Structures are given as C-alpha cells and as structure tokens.
Amino acid sequence: NVLEAQGDELRRLIDGASAGGATPRLIVCTDCESLASVSPLAAPDIIVFDESFTDSQVPFGAFAARRSLLRHWSKRGMTIFHSTTYQPNTISTLHMLHCLRRARPDFMERHAATLARIARDFDFRGRVFAERYSRSLARLIRTVGWHETEVKTSGHYVEIGGRRIFDGVGGVACSIRGHNPPDYLAEIDRLGDPQACREELAARLLELTGLAHATPAVSGASAVEHALKLGLASQYPRERVLVMRGGFGGKTLFALTGTWKTSLRRGIDPLYPHVVYVDPFAADAVTAVESAFERHPIGVIQCELVQGVGGVRPLPADVLRCLAKMRDRHDCLLFVDEVQTGVYRTGPFSRSAELGVQPDLLAVGKGASDMMFPYALTLHSQAIEERLAARHCDLAAVLRSRYDYELGMRTLLNVLRHAAERQLPETVRERGEQFQRVLGEMLRGCGNVREVRSFGLLIGIELEAGAGFRRWLSRVRQQLVLLAMLKHPRMPLLVGYCQYEPHVLKLTPPLSITEEEVENVCETISSVLRLPLSKAVWAGLRPLPKTGSLKSREITI
C-alpha cells in the first residue's frame, strides 16, 4: 500500500536520477496477495515473486524483468551461468502453479488456453521459451535434439522420446538414488511426529560431524552465506576471510566471497571487501597462508577439501595441515564448504571426517535434497553458539525461522536413514574405486587424457588442454565429446565439464549406481575419448535416433 501510494514519487525520483546520468532500476518484491496491485505501480523494471506463491511450504523464488535487462541472461556464454537458470526445481514450480490456481483462479483461467497449448505443442513451447525465458538456452536445447521431445526422469535415467540416457550429472552431485524415488512419499510420511524427527536429525548430525547446531538453507550458496555470517558475527571485530583460490562458494552476493573466478563477480560490485585469497596449489602456498595471518586479522578460513568446480582437485595435505595449525594458533574459525563433497558423495557423510579434520563451520547441500526439494544445511560448533549468545546475537535463530521448512528437514533425515540401512559409505567407496580402476585401464595410452581423479563418486577426467590453435581445437573437440556421449548407441551418457576447468570432464552419478552401470559408463567414456577428431565430429553432430512420433506428446501442468 505504501509503495502504491508513492509510485508516482518513486518514478519521479528515478527519472530525475536518469537525467543526471545514472540508470537506477526499480525492483518491486510482491507476495501472492499483492500481485494484482503491481501493474499500476511505477512501472517496475524487475518484479520478484516470493515464497507466498507456494504457500511457504517449499522453497520458491522467481523474477520477471524488462526485456532489455533479461537479455543479459540470454547472451552468448550466459546460457548456464546460474544453475537455477537451466534446472529450476520442477516440483516447487508445479506446486506454485497449484497454489496459484487456488489463490488466483481468474488469472489461471485467463491464460488457460496458452498454458494448454504450451503443454501439447512443442513448437509453440519452444517459441515461448525462447522469447520469455532464454534464447541461448533454447538454441542449446535444439542443438541436442530435445526441442520436440517429451523428457521424463526416473531412477538413474533421463528418457527423451523413448530413449534412455544415463544421468551422470544428477544436478551436479545432488543424486543419492536417482530421480523421483518411487517410495519417497511413503517414506516421508512414515517418519512421524515433526518434533521427534528434528531431535533424531540433530542427534544423527552431531554423531556424523561433531557439530551440535544446525541452520537450514535452501541452496548450497545460502548455506555458505549462513556459515560466513555466523562465523564473522562470532569473530567480530575480526572481519577478514581467508579463501583458497579455485573455490566456488556460490553465486549469491555474499557467497561470491568464496567464488574465486573473477568473471562471476564482475559487474556486481561492491561485494564483501575483506577477503584474502591464497593459491593452495602454488609452491609457496604454506608460506602465503602464514604471511596472510601476519598481515591481516583473519576471522574465518574458508576452503573446500576437493574443489569440485575447480577441476576435482584435492586441497594439498600440507596446506590443510597449515590451515588447521593457523586456526588453533590464532583462534580463528575453520569453515569447510562440503556442499558438493558432503552427504556421502566421497564415501563418508563428510570428507572432513575421513581426513580427520574438525571444522568449526560445515556447509552441506546437494544430496541433502534427495533430488526432490532444494535443501541445505550449515552446521556450527558449541563454541560459536556460546560466542553469539555472549554478544546477544540472535542471528542463528533468525536464519532458522526464515529458512526452515518441514519437508526439507524430513527429506534429509530420510537420506541419513537410507544411508545407514544400505551402508552407503562403503558402497560409494567401492564404486569410486571401481571407476578409478576401470577408467584407468580403459584410458591407458589414450593421448588426450592426462589423469583420472576419483573421490568416491566425484570423478574428474582431465583432458589435454593444449595452447593456441590446439587449445581452440581441444575446446571444439570437448563439446563434440559431450554430444557423442549423449548419442552413444549402447549407453548414452549425460555428463559435463568443470566450470573453472573446461578441459576436466566431470562425472557425479547417483550414489546408487550399480557395478554393471559403472562398467557401461566407463565403456562409453573410453570409446568416445579414443575417437579421432573426424569421427568425433560425426559422432557428436549426427542426429539423435528417433523413437515414434514426437510431435504431439502431452504433458500435464
């Protein structure tokens, strides 16, 4: 109501600033109830939709923007800039539609014909997607032949037009037992009383991590933000964060503190300024860490034990020992980001436990969702809790009230029970060793493969990058490799590359992958990587085999 009354004044201020050479944007945040009043406001540039559109039952967020602003997300190189741009949570989105149908039946009725056509007409769907969402992503979908095909997921496979493709990405390390676990609803329902579930989850997490306090989050990036906020609040006035270069904290504003790649931070300054970066792979890394503590009041150390986005590279043991020593010597906090390595991805619940490292702060995500709803968690020590209490800081309680939702909590508890019952750590370790052994044997002598690195079921295959023209040729070949694996005649495989290191093929299969599937996936990878360039071109660019008529399949909205 206040914004509606002041709409004309806001627009006048913006026009005045624009006349002075600035280009401010008006961003309006709306809930479901006030949606109808947005249009006559001061013609906002961006409209943000909050979780009231899902009755605050599951995480949801979206925005609409002027075409001139949204164009930035569609230009070359931005197609998969942010994971939620190309893989929004389907269940949360469908729930939003159901809630909107109840709350605004007039709106849904007004657009019913368009929605029905989107559901049944692939060509129309593609045009709307390109115009309203992302032209570059629409082009990518056409390139891989998915633009006129119904896509389904079940277990370890994505089915496209009747053709099953093994999902070796799984939301980039989210997949515990594949897509759409058939018993999920019954398992969640059997967990019983919510308070009893919370107490059991807390007890299990304490046993697994040694950390007594948990703060829920709705993404890995928000879990990283929680950790940094809690850590720095307890360490005040020490405001410096020591970050290992090559890390990836996420793409929200504070999580970018731990995201090393400058191109991901460019253009959205100012970010948190009190950050010191050290290259953990440099020959003088230990000296650089010690020097950073001599020059700066370090409050929090942030690191990943395996840099998943940065090439599936483990933090050197001597650097890790140095960080632990500096933590103890200078009474700072060790924050280990295990959003990608945690929840059994490398075998145990956390790689920290496997390496004998006791963090003060620990972020987990990905697998915590069971590939269903977005969920993540920040764990912190009793010492941090006591420091916050002594400062009368209620930040942890505020974050819990904002980010907690029952279904996410139940989902993680169900994952922990599932892992214990099926001895998941041992299974993941065995499958990881199998991948390392079989890929090592199959790729031995392959000229364009430098190394295979396996940490449980977080696997990187480093290819020759080359330089100059050879580097350009390698990049072209690498894209053809992905397409050739996707179109493999016996075991089609969906896989990707590391974002920082595009010459490192990255595989994050479901933790429930079978021995036979490991063998078949390795055979696909080996057969494609051994192709000469001319055959790789044909294998990557040949049309996808078609199964039946794909023009008029329907989906339900």
Each model region followed by its residue ranges:
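PLP-dependent aspartate aminotransferase-fold enzymes
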Residues: N1-D8, R12-D15, A202-C303, Q307, ...
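N-terminal glycine-rich, Lys/His-bearing helix-loop that initiates the first secondary-structure elements
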Residues: L13, A17-S18, L100-G210, S549-L550, ...
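Conserved C-terminal alpha-helix-loop-beta "cap" of PLP-dependent enzymes
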Residues: K152, G161, N448, L458-T508, ...
